[in-house]
From Swiss-Prot:
Keywords carried by this UniProt record: ATP-binding, Cell inner membrane, Cell membrane, Ion transport, Membrane, Nitrate assimilation, Nucleotide-binding, Translocase, Transport
Enzyme Commission code: 7.3.2.4
InterPro entries on file: AAA+_ATPase, ABC_transporter-like_ATP-bd, ABC_transporter-like_CS, ABC_transporter_ATP-bind, NO3_transporter_ATP-bd-like, P-loop_NTPase
Official protein name in the record: Nitrate import ATP-binding protein NrtD
Length: 274
């Protein structure tokens, strides 16, 4: 039987990244809007977490709280025991829209981040870091091209390399492959896992794609609908690492997990039509 845990099962205080009774309310002309409430989750160091749910379920709110772009109305978000109060280089975000400087080459986009976040390195060491991360994402030959000369998949490779080059403790991925075609998407998912296996940052990834979540994650956090969204269930993903897509998809547990996620999202927490 696949392990499905209620959100309270993840509320131990030993997590590297910890959400403690987190709520977030936004003021609106119609009165306060409760985006999320009573969110409890502990993420271990080096763990890969995917968060899925319908639009408006608070996924982006969680991302902004971990990033430090926003503060909770109630409760707290903690990294290594310290409250997250502002953005910092220990947490890097990769967005769906690439967020690259258009006038700089792929190499210079990465180099700028390394120089800003790791000034203690010598020029030679910084250059080696950039070279290494360009090689990791397969862009050594395209390193001098600007973003407008790169495909969508290549742009996202640059964004991932830039984020990882500064050695963040937490990598935050906001639907990074959502705008890509199916083939490129699968290629980048596999590349992401290979890169993650090397550096092992803690990953919090927002996605709408159940198959993507099941392939990548150690646990899949499923959100209830908003307003007042919270964690409904947490799927434990049992597949061994390193993972091969064919082996994962052919595992009988994969179909069971997928069915359970679909049941949660499209039957128990389906959006009303009216």
């Amino acid at each position: 039987m696949t392990a499905i845990l209620p959100s309270t099962a993840a509320t131990v205080n030993t997590g590297f990244l910890h959400f403690d009774c987190v709520g977030k309310t936004f003021p609106t002309p119609r009165g306060p809007y409760v985006a999320i409430e009573d969110v409890n989750l502990s993420v271990q160091q080096g763990e890969f977490i995917c968060v899925i749910g319908h639009s408006g379920c608070g996924k982006s709110t969680l991302l902004n709280l971990v990033s430090g772009f926003s503060q909770p109305t109630s409760g707290g978000v903690y990294l290594d025991g310290q409250p997250i109060q502002e953005p910092g280089p220990d947490r890097m975000v990769v967005f769906q829209n690439y967020s690259l400087l258009p006038w700089k080459s792929a190499r210079d986009n990465i180099a700028l981040a390394v120089k800003a976040a790791r000034p203690h390195l010598s020029t030679s060491e910084q250059r080696q870091v950039v070279d290494h991360h360009l090689e990791l994402v397969g862009l050594t030959e395209a390193q001098h091209k600007r973003p407008d000369q790169l495909s969508g998949g290549m742009k996202q490779r640059v964004a991932i390399a830039r984020a990882l080059s500064i050695r963040p403790e937490v990598l935050i991925l906001d639907e990074p492959f959502g705008a890509l075609d199916a083939i490129t998407k699968e290629e980048l998912q596999e590349e992401l896992l290979n890169i993650w296996e090397e550096a092992r940052p803690t990953v919090l990834m927002i996605t709408h794609d159940i198959d993507e979540a099941l392939f990548l994650a150690d646990r899949v956090v499923m959100m209830t609908n908003g307003p007042a969204a919270t964690i409904g269930e947490v799927l434990e993903i049992p597949f061994d690492r390193p993972r091969e897509r064919e082996a994962v998809v052919e595992d009988p547990r994969y179909a069971q997990l997928r069915t359970e996620a679909l049941d949660f999202l499209y039957r128990r927490f389906a959006h009303d039509d009216d």
